[in-house]
Amino acid sequence: MRRARYIFVGALFLVLMVLVHGGAELQASLDPPGPPAEGTVAALQAWLTSGLPAVAHTAAYYRVIFSIWATIFLLTPALCFHIFSRSTAANTYWRAFWTAAYLAFLVHIYWAVSRVCGGDVHVVFNSKVATAAFPECLIEHPRPDFLLAAWWGLDVVLAWLITDNIKWLRAERGAVHMLAFAMFFGAFVLATKAGIVAHLLGILMAILVLGCVLIRLIVQENDPKSLIAILYVGFFQFLNLFVRWDKLPTLLGVSNLAALREVLRSKNLHNTSDIAVTEEKGLRPTVPYDPRYLCEREDDGQYNDLSKPTMGNAALNPDDPFNGPEFTQSNPGARFGRNIPLSEVDPTRDGDILDPSPRLVSNRLLARRKTSDGGDDFKPAGILNLLAAAWIQFQTHDWFNHGTPRPIDDDPFDVPIPPGDSWPGKMLVRRTRPDPTRKPNDHAGPTTYANAETHWWDASQIYGDSPQAGAKYRTWKDGKLAVDPNTRLIPLDPTGVEVTGLTSNWWLGLSLLHNLFTLEHNAICDHLIKAFPEWRDDPQKTPLEKDAQIFRVARMVNNSLMAKIHTVDWTPAILTHPALQVAMNANWWGLAGEHVKKYLGRISTSEAISGIPGSVANQTGADYCLTEEFTAVYRLHPLLPNDIAVRHFQGDRPGRTLKFEANDLNDPDLIVGPNAMTNALRDASLIDLIYTFGVHNPGAVTLQNFPNWMRRMRRRTGTKLEEMIDLAAIDILRDRERGVPRYNRFRKLFHKPPVRSFEEMTSDPELAKTLREVYGHPDKVDLMVGMYAEEPPEGFGFSDTAFRVFILMASRRLKSDRFYTDDYTPAVYTQAGIDWIDNNNMTTVLLRHFPELTPILQRTPNAFAPWKVS
């Protein structure tokens, strides 16, 4: 087949050369001296010569003209095929046409120099040469022509000698093609003496080539190694030296974000799974392959990536049937990765790990200030409601969990207590649970930590990480999860906590969302049974097999719906900048838009045009996992308020105030820990609680807005209370312990300039003064503190520095997961399941289970924005 393509193009070249020679002779014979002829032939002759220079129209002259026409005739398909050269067939045609066009160009140069310009070699080096025969030599500016010919010839030789996809060769080839296009476009379209035929050929070339570029952008995934991509990224890197992306017009800002994501994908994904295992007894075994893994998620995350079964899986506690967070086995696929080079992972790079004291930072820069009446000064985030705060914890419980820390007597951190602090006794902080696959004295690479949850976006906070966990919450009938038929609530275990996948750090907000999406799972089951009644009625299957089929698909649909809600509802609510509204919808639907995706399906393999779901999975050079830096930027505890004043749905009446802390754990107003939902429902309905969360604001993610009740918590294990903790101080300490760089170093590693002063870090002079007193130098400021101090872009609920990590990892969670890419198909989800995901969002989920909210949610464009009561 390849030989046939070469023969075809070679034959076309020979035919064109015959036509050039014969046509020139014929045209010269029809162009005698004297008055112009009349008739059809004369009209054709006049059209062909229209706009050409008034010189002697000999056969040699016409060979020059016709040979350059033949060159552009062959060059146009060469340029078009080059755009699609990742295809084997297109690459073959490109090589053939590129070579043929070059040979035609050499013929043109031969006739131009040897015949028209009298064989004067000076024409190669001079901008204009005239001869006695041709006072106006056609080659007015030959130097670029010959430079192009030399470069083009070199590339033709390379095209036949080197077939490997080498980076420098791709860049060189892209450059010479762009030069050829620019020069031929200039000579054929912009030159005043080119003639009407040349103008038409140049315009046709431009239309076809630019059309192919457009088609390429639409139908194929972007190649970040292409010259166009390199220039695209380089343009925005240069532009950002003068103006930040969020200051650009919307579409230009979206393009800037896409360029920034390419930079981050190429420079900010670093494997820890390659670090050798040195503790064999801590290595978790890989389960054998089963064909069912092709179309269903495993509880522990194995076999999501079929080529690397352990990629992104959870660490394991083989002694706990529910795979609890006190894991004792793991493998490299469960490790947290890094968004910074491994050589940068050093807990002591920026000084002593306890300097300055995390407690001092907590007291002076994080704690909510006291008001005149002795309360805590709460700074609200006016763009969000409290559901948004609950939602992000609901999601992070799915994503990451470093496990139960080491025991309090196992070499804890002894945090210095500032003078005059009221903290009772010593502040001892447990260390992070170590990676079981590495010995404590292993210095072959940076310290690594394992994830007690799967790294995949798989709704493990509801469905758990083990089959035994599923046995707790499933009904084993019609694929449904257990709910009380009278209250529609998840049943409680003996401790008063809902029976669901993950219940650590439990409070009312988590309870509401676990209950809501348990109801949603069951609604999806009903939808599937209606669409496929044979699933329930199939006599060839046992009741458990019928249940398993419905459960599997309902879980996949519910899981993907939550991912969609996070992408197109939650993120645009907390990032209201116009560019983000476009970009986040494009992540899911593509720039072609929701309606095109719904009614025409994917019109492109490109994630930019048709969205990530259904595109081709890509690990972008590093095994998929979540990262320590991703964990660090999701420290959003200021979102939580001091307390929650219930508002009753009917009449928006005030109710009692629910508390996050109490001296008595049996306090009926306490909504943290066991019985959180039971306490809240004492004199309120479920819809009252949903309504309350919809109308109240969470806290702003800024300095001096960390809830004080979280700075004097008692660590809870089940119903057992242990040591008192300051969560703000622990947040600071955890980043240092895990080698997350401090603020300025972090900015540099994420391609942002470091701040030079505390006044540049914050516009508040009092905060700048406090920062100076606590840290002394901007380079010592902790990442979390710097992000909270930073003035965010317009409409942002958090800093641009944190957003850098989100740009990279938000799309990676989708793009690396085959169940959102290659296997996001009706074969896995069913068409009814895909339609359910397409046609629903957070608003429709709420209305399905609480239709009374219709008047309010119809007035509210985003369910995570403050609800418009009237």
Across the structure, where does each feature detected by a protein language model lie?
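Short linear, low-complexity motifs centered on an aromatic residue
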Residues: 756-774
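N-terminal accessory/cap region of cofactor-dependent oxidoreductases and related radical enzymes
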Residues: 226-527, 532, 537-541, 552-729, ...
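Catalytic cores of extracellular degradative/oxidative enzymes
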Residues: 549
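Long, well-ordered mid-to-C-terminal structural blocks that present hydrophobic/aromatic surfaces
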Residues: 93-96, 103-105, 109-110, 722-760
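Intrinsically disordered, low-complexity acidic Ser/Thr-rich regulatory segments
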Residues: 52-56, 494, 543
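Membrane-embedded alpha-helical bundles that constitute the cytochrome b-like, heme-associated redox core
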Residues: 2-228
